[in-house]
Amino acid sequence: MSNNANNCLPLASYTLAVFPGIPVAPIEQDFPVSVRITMAAIDPARIEGDEEEPATLRILKPADNFDDEDDEDDEDEDDDDEDDEVSAEDMAQIKKLIAANEDGLDEVEGGDDDEDDDEDDEMEFEEDDEDDDDEGEIEDFVVCTLSPKFGYQQTLDLVITPGEQIMFEVTGSYAIHLSGNYIEHPYDMEDEDELLALGEDDEDDEDELDEGEYDLSPDEDEVINGDERLVELMEQDDEDDEDDEDEEEEPVVEPKKILKRAAEEKKQEKAAKKAKVAFTKNLEQGPTPSEPKPKLVTRQLEGGVKIEDRTVGEGPSAKVGSKVGVRYVGKLANGKVFDSNSKGKPFYFSVGKGEVIRGWDIGVQGMKVKGERRIIIPPGMAYGKQKLPGIPPNSQLTFDVKVVNIK
């Protein structure tokens, strides 16, 4: 049993029922896992006998024969010492055997062999009897005593490994139930650790063999290192030669060329200074102003109609009798849009035929295709005092017109 319970890792619950008069092993051979027993509890149901005897849990284990083995070892050593000492009688017997003929020697040897065999047989029987006596010795140890009258259970802390030869037995009138845990004990891991260590040693040996390195003597190391140092010195010498050649190959500049180059550099510096000054002046003036947009020219036509050309356009100009297609947006003086044609079919009318208000007939004349114009029409050239949906009476109207077609 082990006391190293703090280093044990619980794996699963463990239970065992021990009935009176029936020894039971704590660990099954089919499941060799260490266990830690932490509780012993009595079953109040009486099993044996009419009297209510308390139940005592015992551990049974073979007796330790360390003293007997030591005694046997001492006896064996004494026997060996006696055998090493040759008596005078034995020496005389040996001389007689040497002097005898071969036949007599064979008979004497045969007789001695028979006697030795008989003695060996007697020794074996005696040893067997001693072994039988030792094997029959069983020691028992009391773990706890429980009774329904004075104690139902007892806390324990027993760790049992698969290698231990022990059994539990109960004496009394009641069964005792043990509980605890199956555990991962360090003892169980020793074999695995040894195998892993052996495997690592083998891998290390293989790595050393694979590297193909040999242990060289100091003289051989000096020779190899000396060769490497020689190669390094030769390479360094080659590099120095190359540097010398590079220095020799640099062209010699004539004094005239140097002066000429210096003069050119001075000119470039002066030009750079001028550029810097000019650039600085521009910066002081602020960002480059955008090109001023041309002012729109407003022209006043018949009846007070005013026009402003935004885009001149191209092609022939519209005149009286021309049929033009236009896009337009009509606004009041306050900027409110009351009519427009910006998509779909353009609006077509004949110029000067009275198909539109008078301000349109006058304001569209002279426009070209893709031309854009703003036409400002006073009330007298529009709808006058007439009130229309979205157009109050006496309203000044402004139209932005674009010609898309002239026929």
UniProtKB/Swiss-Prot annotation:
Residues 321-407 form the PPIase FKBP-type domain. It comes from Yarrowia lipolytica (strain CLIB 122 / E 150) (Yeast). Inhibited by both FK506 and rapamycin. GO terms for cellular component: chromatin; nucleolus. This is FK506-binding protein 3. Pfam families: FKBP_C, NPL. It comes from the Eukaryota. Its EC number is 5.2.1.8. PPIases accelerate the folding of proteins. It catalyzes the cis-trans isomerization of proline imidic peptide bonds in oligopeptides. It catalyses: [protein]-peptidylproline (omega=180) = [protein]-peptidylproline (omega=0). Keywords: Isomerase, Nucleus, Rotamase. Residues 65-88, 103-136, 236-252 have a biased composition (Acidic residues). Residues 253-272 have a biased composition (Basic and acidic residues).
